[in-house]
Amino acid sequence: MVVAVYPGTFDPLTRGHEDLVRRASSIFDTLVVGVADSRAKKPFFSLEERLTIANEVLGHYPNVKVMSFTGLLKDFVRTNNARVIVRGLRAVSDFEYEFQMAGMNRYLLPDVETMFMTPSDQYQFISGTIVREIAQLGGDVSKFVFPSVEKWLTEKVAAMGGPVA
């Protein structure tokens, strides 16, 4: 049984993330979506909110587990007995950082492989950062996120005082 880990902040989870989960879950026996605590990144959504959102969007995949983690990815990978780390590459600009991370992960976890996946064409330009910015400016994010995520974004932006004009 091959277990893979797909780590990220998922702030918020986008259609691009779901596309990668759908495709990776068809390759591996179990795919663990690791929602990183990442307080240093100052996430828009709390860890609990991001876990809830991920479970709402991904809960129908029978071989996908959504879990949070803090600390080093290597420890999360070991805890889940994973043999593969899945990472998405949207553009060449992602590659340099991801390549460095894959090298460090290989050093820390010599028996674990990193698998890069590119998004489907319609999702290549989507990022959580861009989606958050559009939502905070009152724009339509419905093509980039699922309806439940759009609702979360709308409510969060409203709680922060509404869209920035």
From Swiss-Prot:
Single GO MF descriptor: ATP binding
Enzyme Commission designation: 2.7.7.3
Cofactor: Mg(2+)
Pfam families, per the entry: CTP_transf_like
Recorded name of the encoding gene: coaD
UniProt-annotated location(s): Cytoplasm
Catalytic activity line of the entry: (R)-4'-phosphopantetheine + ATP + H(+) = 3'-dephospho-CoA + diphosphate
Identification of the protein by name: Phosphopantetheine adenylyltransferase
Record-linked InterPro entries: Cyt_trans-like, PPAT, Rossmann-like_a/b/a_fold
Natural source organism: Burkholderia lata (strain ATCC 17760 / DSM 23089 / LMG 22485 / NCIMB 9086 / R18194 / 383)
Keyword Oxidoreductase listed: no
Function summary: Reversibly transfers an adenylyl group from ATP to 4'-phosphopantetheine, yielding dephospho-CoA (dPCoA) and pyrophosphate.
SUPFAM superfamilies according to UniProt: Nucleotidylyl transferase
